[in-house]
């Protein structure tokens, strides 16, 4: 009985993880281009916070960083 509960929990966790990861990836061409541009621009920002996080241009300008 305990094994069945363990495997049921494991199956649900894997299904939820795959659903979340599938939803996080854009499926249209423009979405993929934005994702690729974001990854390239992320390393070019001067602000240490913006290097780690995805900041909107208004945040970067307000904090004195180079906007994306």
UniProtKB/Swiss-Prot annotation:
Signal peptide: 1-24
GO cellular component, one term: extracellular region
Main location: secreted
Tissue: Expressed by the venom duct.
Domain of life: Eukaryota
Localization per record: Secreted
Propeptide section residues: 25-45
S-S bonds: 47-55, 50-60, 54-65
Keyword hit for Signal: yes
Keywords: Disulfide bond, Secreted, Signal
Domain notes: The cysteine framework is VI/VII (C-C-CC-C-C). Displays a mini-granulin fold, a structure composed of two short, stacked beta-hairpins connected by two parallel disulfide bonds. This newly described fold is derived from the same cysteine connectivity as knottins (ICK fold). The name 'mini-granulin fold' comes from the structural homology with the N-terminal region of the human granulin.
Family: Belongs to the conotoxin U superfamily.
This protein's name: Conotoxin Vc7.4
Naturally occurring in which organism (per UniProt): Conus victoriae
Lineage: Eukaryota, Metazoa, Spiralia, Lophotrochozoa, Mollusca
């Amino acid at each position: 009985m305990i094994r069945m509960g363990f495997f049921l929990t494991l199956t649900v966790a894997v299904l939820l993880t795959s659903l979340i990861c599938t939803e996080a990836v854009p499926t249209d061409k423009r979405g993929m281009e934005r994702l690729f541009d974001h990854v390239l621009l992320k390393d070019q920002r001067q602000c240490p916070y913006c290097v780690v996080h995805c900041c909107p241009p208004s945040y970067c300008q307000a904090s004195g960083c180079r906007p994306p």
